[in-house]
Curated annotation (Swiss-Prot):
There are three genes which encode the mitochondrial ATP synthase proteolipid and they specify precursors with different import sequences but identical mature proteins. Is the major protein stored in the storage bodies of animals or humans affected with ceroid lipofuscinosis (Batten disease). It catalyses: H(+)(in) = H(+)(out). This is ATP synthase F(0) complex subunit C1, mitochondrial. The modification N6,N6,N6-trimethyllysine is found at residue 104. Homooctamer; the c-ring consists of eight c subunits forming a circle, and each subunit adopts a hairpin shape. Component of the ATP synthase complex composed at least of ATP5F1A/subunit alpha, ATP5F1B/subunit beta, ATP5MC1/subunit c (homooctomer), MT-ATP6/subunit a, MT-ATP8/subunit 8, ATP5ME/subunit e, ATP5MF/subunit f, ATP5MG/subunit g, ATP5MK/subunit k, ATP5MJ/subunit j, ATP5F1C/subunit gamma, ATP5F1D/subunit delta, ATP5F1E/subunit epsilon, ATP5PF/subunit F6, ATP5PB/subunit b, ATP5PD/subunit d, ATP5PO/subunit OSCP. Subunit c, of the mitochondrial membrane ATP synthase complex (F(1)F(0) ATP synthase or Complex V) that produces ATP from ADP in the presence of a proton gradient across the membrane which is generated by electron transport complexes of the respiratory chain. ATP synthase complex consist of a soluble F(1) head domain - the catalytic core - and a membrane F(1) domain - the membrane proton channel. These two domains are linked by a central stalk rotating inside the F(1) region and a stationary peripheral stalk. The chain crosses the membrane at residues 77-97, 112-132. Belongs to the ATPase C chain family. One of its GO terms (biological process) is proton motive force-driven ATP synthesis. SUPFAM superfamilies: F1F0 ATP synthase subunit C (SSF81333). It is found in: Mitochondrion membrane. Coiled coil: none annotated.
């Protein structure tokens, strides 16, 4: 005995539609019969839309976006470390100058060198954060 739903749906329709829903578009086009006119016939694939992108799920894209933001945030932490380093360098300059004012020129040149290195690391961290956000 067949149910009422099985009487109205032919097996050919079930095969055509479920195969199009389960298989990727590229596999369906590669296994389709070749037309004699060399023109692709889209009437054989009623439920498929030709797309030129990877078939990723919404959950996968959300995970990728969250990972991108987490990575950019972790790279931005280095900018705060750069600020702490600059504060330490100039704090040491003030302490050193207070202890021995005659070494003012040498202490200042070392402070500028420390500032430049610390600032370069901060800018490098910021550059990596922007690369993660906008280049990936």
């Amino acid at each position: 005995m067949q149910t009422a739903g099985a009487l109205f749906i032919s097996p050919a329709l079930i095969r055509c539609c479920t195969r199009g829903l389960i298989r990727p578009v590229s596999a369906s086009f590669l296994n389709s019969p070749v037309n004699s006119s060399k023109q692709p016939s889209y009437s054989n694939f009623p439920l498929q839309v030709a797309r030129r992108e990877f078939q990723t799920s919404v959950v996968s894209r959300d995970i990728d976006t969250a990972a991108k933001f987490i990575g950019a945030g972790a790279a931005t932490v280095g900018v705060a470390g750069s600020g702490a380093g600059i504060g330490t360098v100039f704090g040491s300059l003030i302490i050193g100058y207070a202890r021995n004012p005659s070494l003012k020129q040498q202490l200042f040149s070392y402070a500028i060198l420390g500032f430049a290195l610390s600032e370069a690391m901060g800018l490098f961290c910021l550059m990596v954060a922007f690369l993660i956000l906008f280049a990936m």
